[in-house]
């Protein structure tokens, strides 16, 4: 992965984290990695554990950022989330899967557009977008 792409991803995650914090989420983990996959952010909203996939793009030329959360990626996140819940003794906790789409485009590049998609997919990995 090129350095510009890594930079875009890191900026997207920073913007997503700031957005979530400003909207009452409490960040528990960042870049949680398991043999089953990685989860960008794990947060609490109230008493719900929220697993967040962050997607960032420099433009909408190839579609909105959330369109790149494939079924395969969703399944990886669900598996990694299950492992997290098990490891943390939270197997009975309410949880959901959100996507934060961040677009750095044109004059707004310094102030990206952030879109939160709550309940973006379920444990079966079925996208709603």
How would you name each of these model-derived features?
Residues 1-30:
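Acidic-basic catalytic patches of nuclease active cores, encompassing PD-(D/E)XK
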Residues 20, 39-60, 65, 77:
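Conserved catalytic cores of phosphodiester-cleaving nucleases, focusing on short active-site segments
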Residues 26, 49, 94:
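Hydrophobic "anchor" residues on beta-strands that sit immediately upstream
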Residues 30-33, 102-103:
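Short, solvent-exposed loop/turn elements at beta->coil junctions and helix N-caps
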Residues 35-37:
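Short acidic/glycine-enriched loop/turn segments that link adjacent beta-strands
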Residues 56-105:
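Catalytic cores of nucleic-acid endonucleases
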Residues 87-129:
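Domain-level recognition of nuclease-like catalytic cores that cleave nucleotide substrates
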């Amino acid at each position: 992965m090129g350095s510009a792409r890594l930079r875009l991803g890191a900026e997207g995650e920073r913007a997503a984290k700031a957005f979530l914090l400003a909207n009452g989420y409490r960040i528990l983990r960042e870049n949680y990695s398991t043999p089953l996959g990685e989860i960008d952010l794990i947060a609490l909203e109230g008493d719900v554990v929220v697993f967040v996939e962050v997607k960032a793009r420099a433009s909408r030329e190839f579609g909105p950022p959330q369109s790149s959360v494939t079924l395969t990626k969703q399944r990886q996140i669900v598996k990694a989330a299950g492992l997290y819940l098990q490891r943390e003794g939270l197997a009975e906790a309410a949880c959901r899967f959100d996507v934060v789409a961040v677009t750095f485009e044109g004059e707004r590049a310094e102030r990206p557009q952030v879109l939160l998609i709550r309940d973006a997919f379920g444990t079966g990995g079925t996208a709603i977008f």
